[in-house]
């Protein structure tokens, strides 16, 4: 897995959190991150895709997440919401990224930025979502 992509995901989670908390324009957040953070080792194109396309597809993404929640969406930690949204986006719109990579990356980001055991919840939601969105990929993996 690409270190530059991992860094893009981490920065995207931070930027999506900022967007949700402040509702600042995405272009301004994008510009701020490029100017104020070390983005030299980040896959900038992927960061920008995540930052701009996740909000563009937020209703579809959130519908997938809502399907598996055991509590109101508003009670989910905002950082963990951002991580779940990133994971669901990749599961839905980036079939080139293997589902295991999506889940592993999200879990690792949740361990760094989320609440103490938040990564377990992120894992369970993304695992359930992957079973729905990537059923053929999971089936192929089991039969090989």
Would you name each region that the model predicts?
Residues 1-144:
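N-terminal interaction/assembly modules
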């Amino acid at each position: 897995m690409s270190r530059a992509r991992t860094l893009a995901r981490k920065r995207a989670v931070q930027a999506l959190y900022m967007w949700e908390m402040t509702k600042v324009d995405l272009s301004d957040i994008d510009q701020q991150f490029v100017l104020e953070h070390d983005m030299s080792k980040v896959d900038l194109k992927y960061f920008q895709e995540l930052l701009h396309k996740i909000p563009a597809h937020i209703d579809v993404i959130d519908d997938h997440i809502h399907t598996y929640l055991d509590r109101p969406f508003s009670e989910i930690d905002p950082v963990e919401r951002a991580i779940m949204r990133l994971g669901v986006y990749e599961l839905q719109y980036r079939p080139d990224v293997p589902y295991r990579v999506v889940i592993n990356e999200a879990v690792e980001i949740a361990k760094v930025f989320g609440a103490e055991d938040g990564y377990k919840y992120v894992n369970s939601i993304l695992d359930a979502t992957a079973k729905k969105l990537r059923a053929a990929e999971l089936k192929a993996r089991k039969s090989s």
